[in-house]
Amino acid sequence: CGFFCEENHVLSIDGKENIFIIDPIDGTRNYTRKNPICAISVALEQKGRVTLGIVLPLFTDEVYSAERGQGAYYNGTRISVSDRDFKNGIVRTSFSSYDRSLSPICFETARKIFPQVNDLRRYGACSVELCKLAKGEEDRFFELTLNPWDYAAAGLVLEEAGGCLTGRNRNPLDYRKKTLVIAANKKENREKLSSIVSSVLDEHQYQR
C-alpha cells in the first residue's frame, strides 16, 4: 500500500492499488488553542475510489466512520443528512486564510449565498464540517481550495449518509490534487449552491 498525507504529501503511491490518505490534524489552529473543532482523518482509496473513512475529532469521544455501501456512523449509530431545503439550510465555508489572495472570492461568494439561506458559518476544520453535514446538523458546504487529506474520509462519511459532494462544474473529485469542494444534503441543494459559486468564479475569472 501507499500513503498520501499532509506531513509528507506523497509516500510511494505510484502503482499502488491501496492508498491511505491521512491528515494527522485537520484544524491545526484550533488544536493549538485547545478548540475541539479539529480531527484526525484517515481514508482508504482503492483503485481511485475512497472505500473507507474514519474521522476522530480531538478532545472528544466522537468517532465518525463509513465503509462504501455500508452506511455512515457516529459512535456506532447510523446517521443521515437533513431534509432541509435551500433557504432553511446552514452553510459552512472558509475564507482561504492560508492563501489570502483568494479571500476576496470567498467573501464575495459568502455575500451572495448568505441572503438565500438560514445562516452561514465557519469552523476551520473541513473534516468536522462535512461530518456534521452528514449527521444532519448542517446542510451545505463550500470551500475554494482543499487538499485530498482534508476531505477524503469525511467525504465518504457524507456520501454514505445520503449527501453529495463534487468539484467545480459538478466534476468528480480528484484525490491527487487541490480542488474546490461543494457539498450538500440533497442534489438539488448542491446544484443551487454550485450555480452561485460558479457565477462568482466566472466573474473573477478564477481558473483553478
Where are these regions (language model features)?
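An extended, acidic
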Residues: 81-208
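Conserved acidic residues
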Residues: 1, 17-19, 51, 89, ...
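Solvent-exposed alpha-helices and their adjacent loops that cap or buttress functional pockets
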Residues: 11-14, 33, 47, 65, ...
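N-terminal subdomain of lithium-sensitive/metallo-dependent phosphomonoesterases centered on the IMPase/IPPase/PAP
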Residues: 1-25, 203-208
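Acidic active-site catalytic centers that drive phospho-/nucleotidyl reactions
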Residues: 6-7, 23-26, 30, 129, ...
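DPxDG-like acidic metal-binding loop motif
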Residues: 14-73
